[in-house]
Amino acid sequence: MKDVLKRVSDVVWELPKDYKDCMRVPGRIYLNEILLDELEPEVLEQIANVACLPGIYKYSIAMPDVHYGYGFAIGGVAAFDQREGVISPGGVGFDINCLTSNSKILTDDGYYIKLEKLKEKLDLHIKIYNTEEGEKSSNILFVSERYADEKIIRIKTESGRVLEGSKDHPVLTLNGYVPMGMLKEGDDVIVYPYEGVEYEEPSDEIILDEDDFAEYDKQIIKYLKDRGLLPLRMDNKNIGIIARLLGFAFGDGSIVKENGDRERLYVAFYGKRETLIKIREDLEKLGIKASRIYSRKREVEIRNAYGDEYTSLCEDNSIKITSKAFALFMHKLGMPIGKKTEQIYKIPEWIKKAPKWVKRNFLAGLFGADGSRAVFKNYTPLPINLTMSKSEELKENILEFLNEIKLLLAEFDIESMIYEIKSLDGRVSYRLAIVGEESIKNFLGRINYEYSGEKKVIGLLAYEYLRRKDIAKEIRKKCIKRAKELYKKGVTVSEMLKMDEFRNEFISKRLIERAVYENLDEDDVRISTKFPKFEEFIEKYGVIGGFVIDKIKEIEEISYDSKLYDVGIVSKEHNFIANSIVVHNCGVRLIRTNLTKEEVQSKIKELIKTLFKNVPSGLGSKGILKFSKSVMDDVLEEGVRWAVKEGYGWKEDLEFIEEHGCLKDADASYVSDKAKERGRVQLGSLGSGNHFLEVQYVEKVFDEEAAEIYGIEENQVVVLVHTGSRGLGHQICTDYLRIMEKAAKNYGIKLPDRQLACAPFESEEGQSYFKAMCCGANYAWANRQMITHWVRESFEEVFKIHAEDLEMNIVYDVAHNIAKKEEHIIDGRKVKVIVHRKGATRAFPPKHEAIPKEYWSVGQPVIIPGDMGTASYLMRGTEIAMKETFGSTAHGAGRKLSRAKALKLWKGKEIQRRLAEMGIVAMSDSKAVMAEEAPEAYKSVDLVADTCHKAGISLKVARMRPLGVIKG
């Protein structure tokens, strides 16, 4: 790595501007020799990529605690011109939680694609889970990747599904999203019971071109070209939609020809309202406008094939597409004009030649229209039927068409039979029936139904039912085989019943007896009466939209030496379906006291327990108080001012918080309801991961003058709070990534990495994100303010002294992940810039107008927290930082090992014991988090602080050591 970098000083390195063609400025990295050896190679690429963004000034900067992140490296700093430059969510903060490269991601077209290949197919719609509607779909926002650690988590469910991923990747359970590393055997997870078919790259063969429409008006061709439907190639991005619309139209659609003064040609679709709504959604994706839904109720007289007559009240629903161009398009694809019962037609040749997943869409559309739904008699599925009727002279055409369907189904390992049924009025009717349990299961799991929500949901549940029925039968088959083996060895039935391998709800004494006494054949085994009937299964395991509950059977750590990937989506649900399983998808404050180490040490256990009780912590932790949605807007726009006004702090607190705890550009109307709801329930909580609350003592003072001004002396007890904007900040980032990506394209910004999605700062999109991000910063400050209030109350509870008398004043509060409007001197002139600090801290010098007057003589306090069991540093800002790093310095120790690797190496109890041996009381909502945050997982905070000090971008004032710590 040193051969790439140019040495500037002992602790400063330059990444040359010619490292990458697109770089507008060099990279500047602050590292000593030891930290340089620990640097991940991918970080150089991220530094270079940031240097390629428009409007960047001087350098793309990396702090001593730098490590790999999303878009920007964590520990990255960059300043962009406010008029010519950009703002990027990736430069503020975002998490990556990952799955293995071979995870199968289900798409809206019913096929799955390996996760590692998904980054090449970002225009796909993927399946997601909506708690109110069930199955939905979403555009892809991004696909991120990172290198894996040695071990990852593999979970296996009772139904045989397997998912592999990092320990921090969330999986949907009945209790919400839980990281894979925190799942337990026996936990229930939500799965989508559909396997689909593997994606196959279509050819670029032309299906239709202008020559097919040469006889028609040029407006027909223009209409289709404008919508990307001419020329129509097999690899058209909407070919799946086109195939399933055509399939449905062969069943419940028609091309109507009206002969009047002016000949009209239009397409009509028929079905239930919900069905037509879904069809209309697909048509919109093609740019085709459909009519409103026409409905009418009428009485019809029905006479069946056996001569019975009856009257029925029914509702007819239909939509029309009045475009003649679309009608001709569907006709050229193979759909007949006029009544289908009077027409000769076959399966279109292009469908026969298409990839399997395209055929799947055609068949799913056809069966969605005319196929019968899954029905059970006790435990057994009845055949799934497709019936066709035509006039007598078209009998051969019916048979030809159904035989073509039969051949298509066979490609999916689905057996079917065709037979004649009774018909009326000189017509002939034939039925194709999918028969046999295995074939029915294959149909439901590989094809299923499209557009008919009722058929689809029942079909999904039926598929899962048959899967689990097979598993139950397999258990009984193995029992029969094993019982025979043991019986031959002299083991009695009574002895077998006591063995663990025979303890299963589907194994009975009678089954074992029949196996050994009656020589029951394995292939003759029937399902146990303990197995639920289909309706009972739905009641017990069904979830809205055809999703089902599955139980984790096994969890293990496995070795994995390839990349891990994650998917971001546009929709608010922020999940996707991998291997059928639904998966998901700050700052620091120093508070001083007038207590000494000796005064606190005797009560440290009680104090930590009290703090743990009073300050909510842990993954998904929620605040103590409940707030209305309207109050959230006040929090987002007022920050700490709101908290103090509501009684959570002292008026003087505002003076010792960066920006007085409120960015004035915040506008809550730019924050989504989803983000607000996530923030509303979490306000006043610590969270999880590297967020913590630590009771410390000042071990050593390096700068007596600055320490005295900050109110710090040796042996004094202080409290460090490290937390941020919780789920709200993450949600804001997610909400704006897609907007920024589109904006980058619209403004002609070439991105070296899609994770650096951005927009010009002064653009509408840039300002919208900035206002929302300011809300996130205000929320984080308010969150730390409320925690400060409960810290003060906890000290009062334990020491029986008022917080005011304990002099529990804020030394300073500074943000870590933020983009801010600032003025800096560049090339001798004052320039307005937007400074991105991602995992970096502001470090303004003496006499800067943005810092408290009390600190003018020494500069802004800088807080660099260490990891559990090690030191933290209080430092001060400098003029060198203003000149070199836009007034920025490091924000902490910086991870050296990922959470997944830390979990592999250490156990939470072990870390807790080691801390106790050092005299540190540690409490956490999760033992896994204790392991993730093991001291060895981080770079040396001493090396980070030394590097900053040597570089002059912040200077040491004091070093603090922990007495007790609370981890989320």
UniProtKB/Swiss-Prot annotation:
Keyword Nucleotide-binding: yes
Residues noted as binding Mn(2+) 2 in the record, renumbered to the chain: C586, H722, H816
Domain (DOD-type homing endonuclease): residue spans on this chain: 245-414
Keyword Metal-binding: yes
Pfam assignment, any one: LAGLIDADG_3
Keywords for the protein's UniProt record, in alphabetical order: Autocatalytic cleavage, DNA-binding, Endonuclease, GTP-binding, Hydrolase, Intron homing, Ligase, Manganese, Metal-binding, Nuclease, Nucleotide-binding, Protein splicing, tRNA processing
A molecular function GO annotation: RNA ligase (GTP) activity
InterPro entries (UniProt xref): Hint_dom_C, Hint_dom_N, Hint_dom_sf, Homing_endonucl, INTEIN, Intein_C, Intein_endonuc_central, Intein_N
Active site: H891
Swiss-Prot/TrEMBL catalytic activity: a 3'-end 3'-phospho-ribonucleotide-RNA + a 5'-end dephospho-ribonucleoside-RNA + GTP = a ribonucleotidyl-ribonucleotide-RNA + GMP + diphosphate; a 3'-end 2',3'-cyclophospho-ribonucleotide-RNA + a 5'-end dephospho-ribonucleoside-RNA + GTP + H2O = a ribonucleotidyl-ribonucleotide-RNA + GMP + diphosphate + H(+)
Cofactor binding annotation: Binds 2 manganese ions per subunit.
Domain of life: Archaea
Gene3D superfamilies in the cross-refs: Homing endonucleases, tRNA-splicing ligase RtcB
Enzyme Commission number, as recorded: 6.5.1.8, 3.1.-.-
Names of the cofactor(s): Mn(2+)
Binding residues for GMP: 690-694, 816-817, 865-868, 872, 891-894, 967
Subunit field text: Monomer.
Job of this protein: Essential for tRNA splicing and maturation. Acts by directly joining spliced tRNA halves to mature-sized tRNAs. Joins RNA with 2',3'-cyclic-phosphate or 3'-phosphate ends to RNA with 5'-hydroxy ends.
Homology family: Belongs to the RtcB family.
Miscellaneous section: Ligation proceeds through 3 nucleotidyl transfer steps, with 2',3'-cyclic phosphate termini being hydrolyzed to 3'-P termini in a step that precedes 3'-P activation with GMP. In the first nucleotidyl transfer step, RtcB reacts with GTP to form a covalent RtcB-histidine-GMP intermediate with release of PPi; in the second step, the GMP moiety is transferred to the RNA 3'-P; in the third step, the 5'-OH from the opposite RNA strand attacks the activated 3'-P to form a 3',5'-phosphodiester bond and release GMP.
Stated name of the protein: tRNA-splicing ligase RtcB
Organism: Methanocaldococcus jannaschii (strain ATCC 43067 / DSM 2661 / JAL-1 / JCM 10045 / NBRC 100440) (Methanococcus jannaschii)
